[in-house]
UniProtKB/Swiss-Prot annotation:
It is a peripheral membrane protein. It is found in: Plastid, Chloroplast thylakoid membrane. Disruption phenotype: Non-photosynthetic phenotype due to the absence of photosystem I (PSI). Can grow only in vitro on sterile sucrose-containing medium. Under normal light conditions, mutant plants show severe pigment deficiency and leaf bleaching due to the accumulation of photooxidative damage. Under low light conditions, mutant plants show a light-green phenotype, very slow growth and delayed development. Keywords: Chloroplast, Membrane, Photosynthesis, Plastid, Repeat, Thylakoid, TPR repeat. GO terms for biological process: photosystem I assembly. GO terms for cellular component: chloroplast thylakoid membrane. Interacts with Y3IP1. Essential for the assembly of the photosystem I (PSI) complex. May act as a chaperone-like factor to guide the assembly of the PSI subunits. HAMAP family: Ycf3. It comes from the Eukaryota. The keyword Membrane applies. This is Photosystem I assembly protein Ycf3.
Length: 168
């Protein structure tokens, strides 16, 4: 049974109903509909913390989805799961792949910056300030891109950029 039929969450049910109506009204191929079903089931599993199931659904959605914009969100969500699992190198790879298909994903730039900042903090703890600065500089570049796409968002990042004199 598809996950969308067993989820008891009101918001998920509402989303599923609206999505099903749109899939009937908007002209789409059966492959696109199936890809969206896997994507929707992946989001549902991810929201419940069932990352293995979410990844299976996302990979299947990637196999079926042909639209680069839609693929960018699938890749972004795969990156989120890898971030949650502490697999930062894999997460960065998926965020990069998402941005290749959709360069207007500020949340991907933000998440990449957070990972780089975290790695900078780790380098400081290991006593390597030179490596830390390189990671912080990379974080700054990603945050600048996120802020440029959505001015007024990422206030903490904006403040960090100012405090560390990395904001131009």
């Amino acid at each position: 049974m598809p996950r969308s039929r067993i989820n008891g969450n009101f918001i998920d049910k509402t989303f599923s109903i609206v999505a099903n109506i749109l899939l009937r009204v908007i002209p789409t191929t059966s492959g696109e509909k199936e890809a969206f079903t896997y994507y929707r089931d992946g989001m549902s599993a991810q929201s419940e913390g069932n990352y293995a199931e979410a990844l299976q659904n996302y990979y299947e959605a990637m196999r079926l989805e042909i639209d680069p914009y839609d693929r960018s969100y699938i890749l972004y969500n795969i990156g989120l799961i890898h971030t949650s699992n502490g697999e930062h190198t894999k997460a960065l790879e998926y965020y990069f792949r998402a941005l290749e298909r959709n360069p207007f994903l500020p949340q991907a730039f933000n998440n990449m910056a957070v990972i780089c900042h975290y790695r900078g903090e780790q380098a400081i703890q290991q006593g390597d300030s030179e490596i830390a600065e390189a990671w912080f500089d990379q974080a700054a570049e990603y945050w600048k891109q996120a802020i440029a796409l959505t001015p007024g968002n990422y206030i903490e990042a904006h403040n960090w950029l100012k405090i560390t004199r990395r904001f131009e």
